[in-house]
């Protein structure tokens, strides 16, 4: 009986020494240590005395796996990051998990779209703010930023305000509450509408755009009017004070240049001036406005139409027909009848 007690005491002593060695050096595990670990889990000792205080080391399971892998001939697994984490006792696992989350807000701060868009009230009233440079409001006009609004901002009435007379958003509401906001919006629209627009003084052909605009507006104002605009002669256009000099206007051409440009395409004689041909009345243009030949029975109608058109063009001229002012087609037809 005495021998059994002595052997149990020696066994406990050796187990404590083995645990101390393992705590100092984890790199040299032994098979005996694994057996002692199994005893430490809760198995009874040799004399049948159960251990009251059993301690489970975090690396005991790792040593068991390493022993089994060595017996099977497999390479021993290396220490994982989780097992090596318990070696460092400077901070716990929970502190390590909270450490990166505490660094994130300080590293990068995401500002809202309203950052520094309003003045700081404590700074304006007292001249100081407890937040300092970290304040979300502007400390002075130089820090104030312009707020980007939606295109439909303050363009519709606030239904809540005009229904119950109260809006929880107050001045931050995106809809119109009173007439002052409507007037402010209208003033902003007037400023945007008063911006100067690009105006082209002359078109490519050299005609003033103001005259064309006036003619277009005149036609739009009187849509039932069929009176054509007055035909301007070349001398009137060239002598108009609205036209710039030839040196300043890159699209100004002389009569000789116009003759060289339009003579091949229009079949004009070399000595004739194209400007006088271009601005001749319709009744005096022999080749451009020739009508197709018509039957003999409709000559009276055409002559009547010719007389009415010539009287409307001449104005104060007599309604009698002149053979020199008649179109060539009617002249030929009258000659054939004779």
Curated annotation (Swiss-Prot):
Modification after translation, per record: Phosphorylated. Phosphorylated by RPS6KA1 at Ser-334 upon phorbol 12-myristate 13-acetate (PMA) treatment; this phosphorylation results in dissociation of the CCR4-NOT deadenylase complex and induces p38 MAPK-mediated stabilization of the low-density lipoprotein receptor LDLR mRNA. Phosphorylated by protein kinase AKT1 at Ser-92 and Ser-203 in response to insulin; these phosphorylations stabilize ZFP36L1, increase the association with 14-3-3 proteins and mediate ARE-containing mRNA stabilization. AKT1-mediated phosphorylation at Ser-92 does not impair ARE-containing RNA-binding. Ubiquitinated. Ubiquitination leads to proteasomal degradation, a process inhibited by phosphorylations at Ser-90, Ser-92 and Ser-203.
Region annotated Necessary and sufficient for the association with mRNA decay enzymes and mRNA decay activation, chain positions: 1-111
Localisation per UniProt entry: Nucleus; Cytoplasm; Cytoplasmic granule; Cytoplasm, P-body
Start-end of Basic and acidic residues biased regions: 82-96
Zn finger residue spans: C3H1-type: 114-142, 152-180
This protein's GO CC annotations: cytoplasm; cytosol; nucleus; P-body; ribonucleoprotein complex
Chain segments carrying region Necessary for mRNA decay activation: 185-338
PROSITE patterns hit by this protein: ZF_C3H1
Main location: nucleus
Tissue-wise expression: Expressed in preadipocytes and adipocytes. Expressed in the proximal and distal tubules in the renal cortex (at protein level). Expressed in ovary, heart, kidney, lung, spleen and thymus. Weakly expressed in brain, liver and testis. Expressed in osteoblasts. Expressed in embryonic stem cells (ESCs). Expressed through B lymphocyte development.
UniProt record, GO biological process: 3'-UTR-mediated mRNA destabilization; apoptotic process; cell population proliferation; cellular response to cAMP; cellular response to epidermal growth factor stimulus; cellular response to fibroblast growth factor stimulus; cellular response to glucocorticoid stimulus; cellular response to hypoxia
Polar residues bias spans: 101-113
A Pfam family per the record: zf-CCCH
Mutant lacking the gene: phenotype: Embryos die in utero at 11 dpc. Exhibit extraembryonic, intraembryonic, vascular and neural tube defects and cardiac abnormalities at 9.5 dpc. Show a reduced number of circulating blood cells. Show failure of chorioallantoic fusion. Exhibited increased level of VEGFA protein level in embryonic fibroblasts under both normoxic and hypoxic conditions. Knockout mice lacking both ZFP36L1 and ZFP36L2 during thymopoiesis lead to aberrant T cell development and subsequently develop a T-cell acute lymphoblastic leukemia (T-ALL). Show also higher levels of NOTCH1 protein and mRNA in thymocytes.
Keyword set, alphabetical order: Cytoplasm, Developmental protein, DNA-binding, Metal-binding, mRNA processing, mRNA transport, Nucleus, Phosphoprotein, Repeat, Ribonucleoprotein, RNA-binding, Transport, Ubl conjugation, Zinc, Zinc-finger
Upregulating conditions: Up-regulated during myogenic differentiation in a p38 MAPK-dependent manner. Up-regulated in response to fibroblast growth factor FGF4 in embryonic stem cells (ESCs) in a p38 MAPK-dependent manner. Up-regulated during high sodium diet-fed in the renal tubules. Up-regulated upon hypertonic stress condition with raffinose (at protein level). Up-regulated by parathyroid hormone (PTH) in calvarial osteoblasts. Up-regulated in response to adrenocorticotropic hormone (ACTH). Up-regulated in response to cAMP. Down-regulated by bone morphogenetic protein BMP2 treatment in calvarial osteoblasts.
Quaternary organization: Associates with the cytoplasmic CCR4-NOT deadenylase and RNA exosome complexes to trigger ARE-containing mRNA deadenylation and decay processes. Interacts with CNOT1. Interacts (via N-terminus) with CNOT6. Interacts with CNOT7; this interaction is inhibited in response to phorbol 12-myristate 13-acetate (PMA) treatment in a p38 MAPK-dependent manner. Interacts with DCP1A. Interacts (via N-terminus) with DCP2. Interacts (via N-terminus) with EXOSC2. Interacts with XRN1. Interacts (via phosphorylated form) with YWHAB; this interaction occurs in a protein kinase AKT1-dependent manner.
Protein role: Zinc-finger RNA-binding protein that destabilizes several cytoplasmic AU-rich element (ARE)-containing mRNA transcripts by promoting their poly(A) tail removal or deadenylation, and hence provide a mechanism for attenuating protein synthesis. Acts as a 3'-untranslated region (UTR) ARE mRNA-binding adapter protein to communicate signaling events to the mRNA decay machinery. Functions by recruiting the CCR4-NOT deadenylating complex and components of the cytoplasmic RNA decay machinery to the bound ARE-containing mRNAs, and hence promotes ARE-mediated mRNA deadenylation and decay processes.
Record's protein name: mRNA decay activator protein ZFP36L1
Origin species: Mus musculus (Mouse)
């Amino acid at each position: 009986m005495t021998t059994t007690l002595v052997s149990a005491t020696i066994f406990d002593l050796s187990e404590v020494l083995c645990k101390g060695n393992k705590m100092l050096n984890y790199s040299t595990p032994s098979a005996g240590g694994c057996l002692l670990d199994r005893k430490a889990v809760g198995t009874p000792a040799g004399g049948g005395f159960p251990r009251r205080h059993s301690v489970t080391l975090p690396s005991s399971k790792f040593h068991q796996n390493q022993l089994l892998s060595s017996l099977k001939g497999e390479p021993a697994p290396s220490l994982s990051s989780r097992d090596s984490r318990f070696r460092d006792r400077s901070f716990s696992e929970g502190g390590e998990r909270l450490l990166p989350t505490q660094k994130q807000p300080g590293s990068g701060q995401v500002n809202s779209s309203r950052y520094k868009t309003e003045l700081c009230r404590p700074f304006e009233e007292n001249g100081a703010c407890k937040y300092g440079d970290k304040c979300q409001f502007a400390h002075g006009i130089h820090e104030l930023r312009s707020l980007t609004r939606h295109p439909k901002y303050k363009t519709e009435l606030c239904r809540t305000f005009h229904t119950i007379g109260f809006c929880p958003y107050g001045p931050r509401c995106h809809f119109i509450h009173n007439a002052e906001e409507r007037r402010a919006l209208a003033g902003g629209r007037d400023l945007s509408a008063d911006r100067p627009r690009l105006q082209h003084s002359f078109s490519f052909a050299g005609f003033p755009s103001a005259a064309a605009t006036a003619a277009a507006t005149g036609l739009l104002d009187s849509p039932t009017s069929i009176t054509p605009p007055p035909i301007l002669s070349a001398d009137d256009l060239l002598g108009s004070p609205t036209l710039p000099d030839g040196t300043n206007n890159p699209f100004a051409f002389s009569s000789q240049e116009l003759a060289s440009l339009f003579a091949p395409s229009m079949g004009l004689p070399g000595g004739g001036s194209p400007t006088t041909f271009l601005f001749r009345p319709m009744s005096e243009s022999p080749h451009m406005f020739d009508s197709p030949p018509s039957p003999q029975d409709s000559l009276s109608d055409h002559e009547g139409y010719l007389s009415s058109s010539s009287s409307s063009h001449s104005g104060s001229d007599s309604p009698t027909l002149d053979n020199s002012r008649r179109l060539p087609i009617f002249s030929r037809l009258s000659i054939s009848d004779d």
